[in-house]
Amino acid sequence: MDELNIEIVAVDRKIWSGKGTFLFTRTTAGEIGILPRHIPMVAQLVDDNMVRIEREGEKDLRVAVDGGFLSVTEERVSILAESAEFDSEIDENAAKQDAESDDPRIAARGRARLRAVGAID
């Protein structure tokens, strides 16, 4: 099966680099699924975003991503984000509190984190 080389980088650290068969995310133009040999593109990610990466024979990766950009070539997907964290790193109760914040940036980050842990769609 064809695979993509995928890299997720936040301002403060490299989050993940590896191979995947499919990547799902949300851009300012709408939801998008990326398969190998996708048309090259660049897109801005929404602030309350969750990236899901399907991998052959392994559990899907779910990453909460705060803003940033997506760059796609036929063989590679790069995500450059303000911040990002794996679902396993997220405190769901703290994310719920953030999602209820009056500050729109904090609320967006909380929603992204809740999407990553599967608490909301």
Swiss-Prot record:
Topology versus the membrane: Peripheral membrane protein
A single GO molecular function term of this UniProt record: proton-transporting ATP synthase activity, rotational mechanism
Origin: domain of life: Bacteria
The organism of origin for this protein: Mycobacterium leprae (strain TN)
UniProt KW keywords: ATP synthesis, Cell membrane, CF(1), Hydrogen ion transport, Ion transport, Membrane, Transport
Keyword 4Fe-4S: no
GO CC terms of this entry: plasma membrane; proton-transporting ATP synthase complex
SUPFAM superfamilies from the UniProt entry: Epsilon subunit of F1F0-ATP synthase N-terminal domain
Described function: Produces ATP from ADP in the presence of a proton gradient across the membrane.
UniProt record similarity statement: Belongs to the ATPase epsilon chain family.
Upper taxonomic lineage: Bacteria, Bacillati, Actinomycetota, Actinomycetes, Mycobacteriales
Protein name, as recorded: ATP synthase epsilon chain
Gene3D superfamilies: F0F1 ATP synthase delta/epsilon subunit, N-terminal
InterPro entries: ATP_synth_F1_dsu/esu, ATP_synth_F1_dsu/esu_N, ATPsynth_dsu/esu_N
Known partners and oligomeric status: F-type ATPases have 2 components, CF(1) - the catalytic core - and CF(0) - the membrane proton channel. CF(1) has five subunits: alpha(3), beta(3), gamma(1), delta(1), epsilon(1). CF(0) has three main subunits: a, b and c.
Localization terms from the record: Cell membrane
CDD domains: F1-ATPase_delta
